[in-house]
Amino acid sequence: QVERNGGIHPESGREKLREVLLSGGDPMVLTNSKLAAWFAALAEAGVESIRVGTKEMAFFPQRFDRTFLEMLDRFHETYPQVGLHMMLHFEHPDEILQKDAEGNYVEDAQGFKQWVPATGEAMRGLAGRGWLTVENQAPIIRGINDDPDALRILQREFKRAGGENHYFFCGRDIVAYKAFNIPIERAWQILNE
């Protein structure tokens, strides 16, 4: 009925759900078959955009292996009208870049910083699919990445690898996070330096 009415529910008058974010925990700990089932169910329900929020590439980049990428390709072949967006969570360039014994980022002959091999391979696997977007979103955390240089390197290297920088945000103002939060004014300053 919703489809027959141009995306408007005939009784409630509301638009259909167009975008879904899979998050809350980490959906990338699910098996490929479970992810495929979720993706297909959402596509069949008429969802136009699926975002997958994950920190898994920082912890276990091998999860983004050939079989996972093949599952994504099959999904896209079946539902090409559905946008798929991988929303990665990297907070600091140390999570993606190699360092030498002195703690400096490793550069190649052209001066480009080198990714940690497994993470770089996973990123290339995702970013190499022109139909899928890869974005980074991260909190600004006191004592971790509240540094303009670190965020600049993170953004530059992520973009150079084929990703986009979605956004940075401040933590929620609750007791458990207070030690890690920075004032929004300071976040604004950092992002504009």
At which residue positions do the language-model features occur?
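C-terminal accessory extensions appended to soluble enzyme cores
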Residues: 186-193
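Conserved AdoMet/S-adenosylmethionine-binding subsite of the radical SAM
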Residues: 3-19, 25-186
